[in-house]
Amino acid sequence: MRSTIASRDFAAIAARVRKIGALNRASLPAVLVMACAFAACSGQEGPSAQLPAPPESTVQAPVDGDWWKQSGDPVLVDLITRGIAADHDLACRGARLANQAEADASADRRLSGRMRKLVGTDQGLSRAASLRADQYAYAQARAARAAAVALAYVEVRRLQKVLVLRTERLDQFRDNAAIAEFRRQAGLVTAIDGGIGSSMAGVADADLAATRARFDRARSELARMTDMDDAALLTALGETGDVPDLGRDPPGPADQGPLHRADLLALRYRLLARIEHEKMTQADIDKAEATRGDPSTPPLLRDGLGELDKAEADARAEIGATRQALVTLDAREPALSQSGERSRRAVQDARSAYRAGMGDFATLYVAEASALSVEEARL
């Protein structure tokens, strides 16, 4: 049974933690991986579970929790794997969590631990909730690292593609300039065409050099993040700059259900650990839930619930902004595609007309520059 913590119902959370007991500490590696999906965390329920099933998320995460493994881009998968492994702070946090889980499990097995449980002085539930919070915080940090590497990779690919486009366009500009000079020498046009052609090639050459410098800087940063040699990274990237289609579904209606995010789950378990440590009653929790912001509410509950509310509101605002950006992108893409097709036809017509002596160089210049702008805008 999926043990997703789906709401701020602390009664259900506390009951679930008490039922799980030690939160299945032996399953730490699975928890660390699954929680990273910002979705459900698979736990082990007791045989007498009577809690109602939590609401299901409308967004299903990959089975193993690592979204990049479903991207269809082996270069991205390799770079994120390297980037996570190269983050020494993240590795240390994972090792500490594994050691803490083993230490807690060992303490529970000792006679003194069992005696503390019998006499009611054990803080095992508080420690268990705190450990689970640390696990989700680790998962959040791991996911953030993966996202940072992915964004750096996409920027490198974008600049690589721009570099390819501008290199191709520079070759065309130089060809146009050569044709203009030939026609000037033949007395067919004035020197203005040759001057414009040389200026076009010079500007394109400068833009290409600036793009190459930005590409080198972005690639250097990606190599640093993934602990790779620059030559090895260049080999892995290849020459085209193409990125496989990730198969993103179009954004649907906003999901107002519970947010299955590791950062929010970490906050909830952190608060639960403090509640258990302070031995607060279920009545305290219910009252705080019913009278949010009441000055008479214990500060621990009042501030903790306020922090959760703010974190969830911020998360929903972030999701809403991302959703709107995707909607805008979906509306923009067809228009850019049509503009790109029109601009390519315009370039072909202007080039043919100029070579046939039926068009002017200024028209060709504008057509070439417009086509390049549209192609780069699509990136």
Q: Model-derived features: where do they sit?
A:
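Short, charged, amphipathic alpha-helical segments
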Residues: 94, 121-128, 191-199, 361-369
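Short flexible linkers and secondary-structure junctions
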Residues: 42-155
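Periplasmic alpha-helical coiled-coil/stalk elements that build and connect Gram-negative outer-membrane
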Residues: 102, 120, 135-258
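N-terminal polybasic/positive-inside topogenic patches
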Residues: 14-20, 26
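Amphipathic alpha-helical coiled-coil segments
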Residues: 92-107, 141, 148-164, 218, ...
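Terminal intrinsically disordered/low-complexity segments used for targeting and assembly
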Residues: 2, 6, 13, 28-30, ...
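Charged, alpha-helical scaffolding/interaction elements associated with membrane systems
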Residues: 86-87, 186, 356
